[in-house]
């Protein structure tokens, strides 16, 4: 923020880089807006990325890449998918991951979700749910913006 504010601009657009709305987004936006009181630059804050078709496409591309890398040539409607989200106490987080899951359901045999922490089903439970469906191939997608869970 400091670097951007030193530039000669009239307006700054802030795009919250989060996969779901919640407490961290609210804190990040509030922290960014604190800078506005000390400048004449107009701040424009967009909605978080959360429920956007581009994110569905991104997850779908990850699935396609995993299948190609592993030389799986089955049709999509023969593939099962498990999406692992972080988990949150904020109910809006579940809405966002459910949007991704629901958007992919028409393309794949089964699409389920589970969570790293905080919410259930946890990863073990998520895999057990998938096993009951007797998948021929199960693609697991980690739905995080960072490489390692914090």
Predicted regions and their residues:
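Extended amphipathic ligand-handling, pore-lining, and cofactor/metal-binding catalytic surfaces
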Residues: 1-150
């Amino acid at each position: 923020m400091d670097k951007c504010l030193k530039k000669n601009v009239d307006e700054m657009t802030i795009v919250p880089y989060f996969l779901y709305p919640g407490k961290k987004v609210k804190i990040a936006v509030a922290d960014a807006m604190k800078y506005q009181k000390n400048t004449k630059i107009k701040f424009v804050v967009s909605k978080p990325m959360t429920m956007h078709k581009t994110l569905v496409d991104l997850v779908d591309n990850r699935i396609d890449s995993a299948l190609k890398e592993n030389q799986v040539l089955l049709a999509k409607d023969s593939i099962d998918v498990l999406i692992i989200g972080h988990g949150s106490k904020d109910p809006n987080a579940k809405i966002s991951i459910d949007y991704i899951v629901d958007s992919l359901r028409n393309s794949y045999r089964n699409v389920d979700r589970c969570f790293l922490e905080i919410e259930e089903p946890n990863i073990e439970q998520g895999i057990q749910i998938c096993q009951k469906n007797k998948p021929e191939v199960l693609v697991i997608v980690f739905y995080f913006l960072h490489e390692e869970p914090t």
